[in-house]
């Protein structure tokens, strides 16, 4: 019986118990030997119903799965991996989480220091591997009684305190020396080293560091009584669902124009802004606003972003985290606050709308888009009518590239419907895994929509979807390549070979390989009939929508061109 292998478990016990106290309920575990102390302690927490463990064979997909869970729960999610390139595979998801302030905690097992840099197998330099993306990089010493258990608990908890206040990623690198197996449970739990923590260990809610959270109540701007009488525009980017409540009514009372991103979960009073803002007359008149207030960030629309770039008046930014959000270098007033807290201390003054043209053009776009999209099942019509494929109490996850732009431009969703995206770095990697994490953690019917290249990029994450035991429907929009690049002014031959990457793949055999249902509808009636069956199953379904390669991008460009040329009185 090895005392060292048991002590490795005791060391891991302190680390994981510290995480529990700050909201970690899920451990996402990749297979590996060096991480055994962490894995077995996580399983012990699952056995006592204090946490739930999940596994996947690909660390990159596992990390995005964890990100999806963090999005759905708004809690920190821990990832356990072994040493070597397993750690490096987490990087894309950690970048995304860092840019969107979602809480991930990486526990990377490592070789002990004496085995680094000397040619030992599966040993790389792991400390600092994620550069400055984590808010805390903790490189622990090799598990040893030379360090007090209280020091270890305090070190982990302090990182968690920081994460509670600012979101983002924590990296904890934990070297373990062999042996790693054949432990004694009694020895793990009753080592004298743990004695100072006994009262802490038996109370899962007791914290070693009782840090008070920063209570910085937002105050009313000293000149709000002046600004609320002026002409204003409110722009809402990505927001948590609960923060969007009340923004529409607040804007309507003020008589201000409200432009909402599809990620805002706010009912759009002026939908299709990405289309109607292409009209230069309306764009210029909207620039006559005295003040713009922006809630949230990660705005998708190119036209809305252009408006923000062109606006030179008073600019206020409201965001709950102390991060720098100023892509257009505005002279700005920053409010570190949740949106609904800001509204509470800035009462509106009832006024008539100061600009009517956006409403008129938005209403025109509603009928015009319907006419242009038509009744066939295609990329644009699915984006325009996406609400018709959603469950009443479900989630929508939208991938990147062309389709997310089409949804933002052409769709109007009900107030408060949960919409998830990966728009921090806006990559196409890990999208299916992220959707699977959202579906798993929320327990609600979930629809995800990705392009064919995105699906190919994350193909093995369909394995994660196959484990979901409630309706989870993955739409693959197959336009035989990267259709978003049709928007680029690149010579056709070069575009085809190095941008679009056209193919003739289809996804029926992929679904068969992972043992999930597959449907390929050709009409809206066919889709709705088959979706009814899919929602009746407690499992995942792939819906492949095969479309002509340039139809979506051509319609998008045509709508923008026609509305840009419309004459406004």
Swiss-Prot record:
The keyword Protein biosynthesis is assigned to this record: no
Cofactor, how bound (note): Binds 1 thiamine pyrophosphate per subunit.
Molecular function via GO: 2-succinyl-5-enolpyruvyl-6-hydroxy-3-cyclohexene-1-carboxylic-acid synthase activity; magnesium ion binding; manganese ion binding; thiamine pyrophosphate binding
Function noted in UniProt: Catalyzes the thiamine diphosphate-dependent decarboxylation of 2-oxoglutarate and the subsequent addition of the resulting succinic semialdehyde-thiamine pyrophosphate anion to isochorismate to yield 2-succinyl-5-enolpyruvyl-6-hydroxy-3-cyclohexene-1-carboxylate (SEPHCHC).
Coiled coil stretches, renumbered: none
Main EC class the enzyme belongs to: transferase
Record flagged with keyword Manganese: yes
Cofactor entry: Mg(2+); Mn(2+); thiamine diphosphate
Pathway of action: Quinol/quinone metabolism; 1,4-dihydroxy-2-naphthoate biosynthesis; 1,4-dihydroxy-2-naphthoate from chorismate: step 2/7; Quinol/quinone metabolism; menaquinone biosynthesis
Quaternary structure and partners: Homodimer.
Family that this chain belongs to: Belongs to the TPP enzyme family. MenD subfamily.
Catalyzed reaction equations: isochorismate + 2-oxoglutarate + H(+) = 5-enolpyruvoyl-6-hydroxy-2-succinyl-cyclohex-3-ene-1-carboxylate + CO2
Protein name: 2-succinyl-5-enolpyruvyl-6-hydroxy-3-cyclohexene-1-carboxylate synthase
Enzyme Commission code(s) on record: 2.2.1.9
Highest taxon above the source species: Bacteria
Lineage per the UniProt record: Bacteria, Pseudomonadati, Pseudomonadota, Gammaproteobacteria, Pasteurellales
GO biological process, one term: menaquinone biosynthetic process
Swiss-Prot/TrEMBL keywords: Magnesium, Manganese, Menaquinone biosynthesis, Metal-binding, Thiamine pyrophosphate, Transferase
């Amino acid at each position: 019986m090895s005392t060292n292998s048991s002590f490795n478990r005791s060391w891991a016990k302190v680390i994981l118990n510290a995480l529990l106290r700050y909201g970690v309920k899920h451990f996402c575990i990749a297979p590996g030997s060096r991480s055994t102390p962490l894995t077995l302690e996580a399983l012990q927490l699952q056995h006592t119903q204090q946490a739930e463990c999940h596994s996947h064979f690909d660390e990159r997909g596992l990390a995005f799965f964890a990100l999806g869970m963090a999005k759905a729960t708004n809690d920190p999610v821990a990832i356990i991996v072994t040493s070597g390139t397993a750690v490096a595979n987490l990087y894309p998801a950690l970048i995304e989480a860092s840019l969107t302030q979602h809480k991930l905690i990486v526990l990377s097992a490592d070789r002990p220091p004496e085995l680094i840099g000397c040619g030992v197998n599966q040993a790389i330099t792991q400390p600092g591997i994620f550069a400055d993306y984590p808010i805390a990089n903790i490189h622990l010493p090799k598990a040893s009684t030379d360090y007090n258990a209280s020091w270890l608990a305090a070190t982990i908890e302090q990182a968690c305190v920081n994460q509670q206040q600012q979101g983002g990623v924590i990296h904890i690198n934990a070297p373990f020396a062999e042996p790693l197996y054949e432990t004694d449970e009694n020895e793990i739990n009753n080592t004298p080293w743990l004695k100072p923590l006994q009262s802490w260990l038996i109370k899962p809610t007791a914290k070693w560091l009782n840090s008070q959270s920063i209570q910085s109540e937002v105050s009313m701007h000293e000149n709000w009584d002046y600004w609320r009488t002026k002409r204003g525009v409110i722009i809402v980017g990505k927001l948590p669902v609960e923060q969007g409540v009340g923004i529409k009514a607040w804007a309507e009372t003020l008589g201000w124009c409200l432009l909402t991103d599809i990620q805002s979960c706010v009912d759009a009073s002026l939908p299709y802004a990405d289309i109607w803002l292409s009209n230069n007359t309306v764009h210029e008149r909207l620039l006559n606003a005295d003040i713009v207030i922006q809630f949230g960030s990660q705005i998708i629309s190119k036209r809305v972003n252009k408006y923000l770039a062109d606006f030179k008046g008073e600019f206020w930014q409201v965001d709950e985290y102390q991060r720098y959000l100023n892509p257009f270098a505005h002279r700005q007033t920053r409010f570190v606050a949740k949106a609904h807290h800001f509204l509470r201390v800035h009462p509106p003054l009832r006024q008539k709308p100061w600009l009517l043209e956006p409403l008129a053009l938005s209403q025109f776009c509603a009928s015009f888009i319907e006419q242009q999209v038509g009744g066939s099942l295609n990329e644009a019509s699915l984006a325009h009518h996406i609400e018709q494929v959603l469950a009443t109490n479900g989630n929508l996850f939208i991938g990147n590239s062309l389709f997310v732009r089409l949804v933002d431009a052409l769709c109007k969703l009900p107030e408060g419907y949960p919409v998830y995206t990966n728009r921090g770095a806006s990559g196409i990697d890990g999208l299916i895994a992220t959707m699977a994490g959202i579906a798993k953690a929320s327990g609600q019917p979930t629809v995800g929509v990705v392009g064919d290249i995105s699906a190919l990029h994350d193909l093995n994450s369909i394995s994660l979807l196959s484990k979901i035991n409630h309706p989870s429907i993955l739409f693959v929009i197959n336009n035989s390549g990267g259709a978003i690049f049709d928007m680029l002014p690149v010579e056709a031959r070069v575009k085809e070979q190095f941008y679009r990457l056209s193919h003739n793949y289809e996804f029926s055999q992929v679904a068969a390989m992972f043992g999930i249902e597959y449907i390929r509808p050709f009409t809206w009636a066919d889709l709705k009939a088959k979706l009814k069956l899919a929602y009746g199953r407690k499992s995942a379904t792939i819906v492949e929508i095969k479309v002509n390669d340039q139809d979506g991008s051509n319609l998008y460009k045509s709508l923008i061109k026609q509305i840009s040329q419309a004459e406004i009185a």
